[in-house]
């Protein structure tokens, strides 16, 4: 069964592909396979808004079931920032390293783990070409390190430590991160719907 990951981000694609392959025989594509596709701009204030907009748009345009997601990093001491600005915190054209640098600057005066607490919130949407959709949410709580650690992952991974872990997301192995991350939690909640799709696809083929 064909399914499209509504992302061109290599790490997101790899993480979602790993999850899907564990479930069964999906024919997995991503937006990298559709160079002429134009993705809508992310303007939502919640991960759910962006994931739903991305998923429904891609499913209709590509005539395929689609998995889309959106993630935001929230720091309560910064009134929820970066939040909806997670991907543009240091500016529209800034890179991940610039965003991390700005976050560290904003948190310079915060010393305790309590003050540096943060959480990732991820929404994943499974959408059909006809506009049907299922959505799930995953949250991972932790805190922001006072310096970068690790070289894996992307975004704010090298700054974020999950509670009860001594390593940042950028230091964890992919296997471990794929079990405990916000995206992993959201994807796991979609398992029954994905398995149902596969079963119906196999029945229709027979």
From Swiss-Prot:
It catalyses: XTP + H2O = XMP + diphosphate + H(+); dITP + H2O = dIMP + diphosphate + H(+); ITP + H2O = IMP + diphosphate + H(+). Binds 1 Mg(2+) ion per subunit. Gene3D superfamilies: 3.90.950.10. Substrate binds at residues 7-12, 71, 154-157, 177, 182-183. InterPro entries: dITP/XTP_pyrophosphatase (IPR020922), ITPase-like_fam (IPR029001), RdgB/HAM1 (IPR002637). GO terms for cellular component: cytosol. SUPFAM superfamilies: ITPase-like. Its cofactor is Mg(2+). Keywords: Hydrolase, Magnesium, Metal-binding, Nucleotide metabolism, Nucleotide-binding. Mg(2+) binds at residue 70. One of its GO terms (biological process) is nucleotide metabolic process. Belongs to the HAM1 NTPase family. This is dITP/XTP pyrophosphatase. It comes from Chlamydia felis (strain Fe/C-56) (Chlamydophila felis). The lineage of its organism: Bacteria, Pseudomonadati, Chlamydiota, Chlamydiia, Chlamydiales.
